Amino acid sequence: MLTLLAPAKVNLSLEVLYRRNDGYHELRSIIQSLSLCDRLSFSPAKTVQISSDSPDWQAEHSLVSKAVALFSEKCGQGRGVNLTIAKRIPLVSGLGGDSSCAAAVLKGLNKLWGCGYPRWRLMELGAELGSDVPFFMMGGTAMMEGRGETVTPLPTLNQMWAVLLVPEIEMPPDKTAALYRNLHADSFSSGEISDKLLEDICQGKLSYSSCFNVFEKIAFTLFPDLAKYRWQFLEAGAYQIFLAGAGPTLFTLLKDKNMAEKIYHNLCQKGHQAYLVSTLGPLD
């Protein structure tokens, strides 16, 4: 049996530069992987069998099934796999769980079926599945550009602690598309925000003032209950709070583990779905 971890991520910066002629948006984003991980187990089988320990996870609505189908078409026609997923990353949370699992599927089947594709080829296949998938082929700290297909590894951040707060807000199935639909001319930026953050990271530091998410204002407008959770996060002791990806997860990053633990425990005592995790370096 082959077992792989699929880590969550947060966007330290997320800029939309413009809308492209092909209908996609040009992105510039610095992404950081986290120690909150799903676990995927692969074993040989005569047919494709996919299952999860989460009753709410549906294979037919996930990128996992699409990743298996795509890789089968490219390399594994007629081959099977018994794939089981232990879900730990909350569904539809903005933490990239579906994309991360899809990347792990491509890597896992590449090993299980002995296809021998190099990482760059797996990243190409990942780009066919979703914008975040190529990043999860390497993880760590990286710059993502284009519509997600261009990923450049960055110096690994010194370990930091992240507290995640997952609001109990019902999100529409087209959450991300809704955020993109609400972008306007003033939402676009030049990429300078990410450049400033990149400069900080290369100097071995992280400036909270350089963190940015273009979707934050839009999300708080479309989903006004987010404001209540942000306020409760502040009451728990956080002082810099950011939106994770397309949300609704909120997070804070700290160098002080004791402070992170205090905030985490304060949130848990209030009955919130919260996680205390650390930043991760590049994947093998």
Curated annotation (Swiss-Prot):
Belongs to the GHMP kinase family. IspE subfamily. InterPro entries: GHMP_kinase_C_dom, GHMP_kinase_C_sf, GHMP_kinase_N_dom, IspE, Ribosomal_Su5_D2-typ_SF, Ribsml_uS5_D2-typ_fold_subgr. It holds the Pfam family GHMP_kinases_C. It comes from Dehalococcoides mccartyi (strain ATCC BAA-2266 / KCTC 15142 / 195) (Dehalococcoides ethenogenes (strain 195)). Pathway: Isoprenoid biosynthesis; isopentenyl diphosphate biosynthesis via DXP pathway; isopentenyl diphosphate from 1-deoxy-D-xylulose 5-phosphate: step 3/6. Keywords: ATP-binding, Isoprene biosynthesis, Kinase, Nucleotide-binding, Transferase. It is an enzyme of class 2 (transferase). Its EC number is 2.7.1.148. Coiled coil: none annotated. GO terms for biological process: isopentenyl diphosphate biosynthetic process, methylerythritol 4-phosphate pathway; terpenoid biosynthetic process. GO terms for molecular function: 4-(cytidine 5'-diphospho)-2-C-methyl-D-erythritol kinase activity; ATP binding. Catalyzes the phosphorylation of the position 2 hydroxy group of 4-diphosphocytidyl-2C-methyl-D-erythritol. ATP binds at P90, L91, V92, S93, G94, L95, G96, G97, D98, S99, S100. The active site is at K9, D132. The gene is ispE. It catalyses: 4-CDP-2-C-methyl-D-erythritol + ATP = 4-CDP-2-C-methyl-D-erythritol 2-phosphate + ADP + H(+). This is 4-diphosphocytidyl-2-C-methyl-D-erythritol kinase. It comes from the Bacteria.
